[in-house]
Amino acid sequence: MSNNNNSPTTVNQETTTSREVSITLPTDQSPQTSPGSSSSPSPRPSGGSPARRTATGLSGKHSIFRGIRLRNGKWVSEIREPRKTTRIWLGTYPVPEMAAAAYDVAALALKGPDAVLNFPGLALTYVAPVSNSAADIRAAASRAAEMKQPDQGGDEKVLEPVQPGKEEELEEVSCNSCSLEFMDEEAMLNMPTLLTEMAEGMLMSPPRMMIHPTMEDDSPENHEGDNLWSYK
C-alpha cells in the first residue's frame, strides 16, 4: 500500500516540474529576440542607400539635379570635359536651381542637343557660349543661372533675352512712318503763286475771272461799248 501511495506523488512532482519549465522557457528566449525588434536602439546600417534618397547624399550631390553638389553651405556647379579627366568649374550659387541651370548650358555646349538637362523646357532660352573654352562656357553658365535667381518674394526670375538697340530701331521706324503720313502739298508746291509763275513763263496773262450776269457793272465804260455798236 505504501508503494501505491508514493507513486502518484512522484508523478505530480514531475508534472509540476514540467509545467515550471514550460513557463520559464519563453522568458529565457525573450531577450534573444529583442535585438531584432523594431525598437532596437542600434539598427544595422543599410550601406548608405537611405542617405542617397535625401536632398544631399553623403558626397554632397543633389538627388535630383545633375552636375551640382553642396559645399560649405553653397551649391557648386561643374562639368567634366568629354574624353578628359578634367572638370570645368561653373560657379558657386546660393540655391540648387541656379547651379543646375549653369550645368545645363555647359552640357549643351560640350555634349550637344542630346545632353541630359535639369530643365529641358528652358533649353531654347539659354544663350550659347561664344566658344567651347572654359572662360566662355563659365560666362554663359553664369547668365543662365541668373534666370533662376529667386527674388525677395521667393519666386524665380524669368529673364527674356533682349537684343540691344532693337527698341530704338522700332521707335525710329514708327516715327518715320508717322512723318510720311502727313504731307503739306501747298508748302511743297507753293500753290498760291504756282499759276502766276506758269503764266509768266508762257508769256500769257492769267485768265480773267468770270463775272456772274447779275453782278455786271453799270459803269459808263460798259455802256459806251454798247452804244457804239448800236449805231448803224
Curated annotation (Swiss-Prot):
PROSITE patterns: AP2_ERF (PS51032)
Any single Gene Ontology cellular-component annotation: nucleus
Disordered, as annotated region: 1-63, 213-232
MF term (GO), any: DNA-binding transcription factor activity
Record-annotated membrane-spanning stretches: none
Record field: compositional bias (Polar residues): 1-29
Disulfide pairings: none
DNA-binding region: 64-120
InterPro entries: AP2/ERF_dom, AP2/ERF_dom_sf, DNA-bd_dom_sf, DRE1A-I
GO biological process terms held by the UniProt record: defense response to fungus; ethylene-activated signaling pathway; glucosinolate metabolic process
Localization: Nucleus
Start-end of Low complexity biased regions: 30-50
Pfam families recorded: AP2
Keywords assigned by UniProt, alphabetized: Activator, DNA-binding, Ethylene signaling pathway, Nucleus, Transcription, Transcription regulation
Function per UniProt: Probably acts as a transcriptional activator. Binds to the GCC-box pathogenesis-related promoter element. May be involved in the regulation of gene expression by stress factors and by components of stress signal transduction pathways.
Family that this chain belongs to: Belongs to the AP2/ERF transcription factor family. ERF subfamily.
Name of the featured protein: Ethylene-responsive transcription factor ERF025
Source organism: Arabidopsis thaliana (Mouse-ear cress)
Organism taxonomic ancestry: Eukaryota, Viridiplantae, Streptophyta, Embryophyta, Tracheophyta
Name of the gene: ERF025
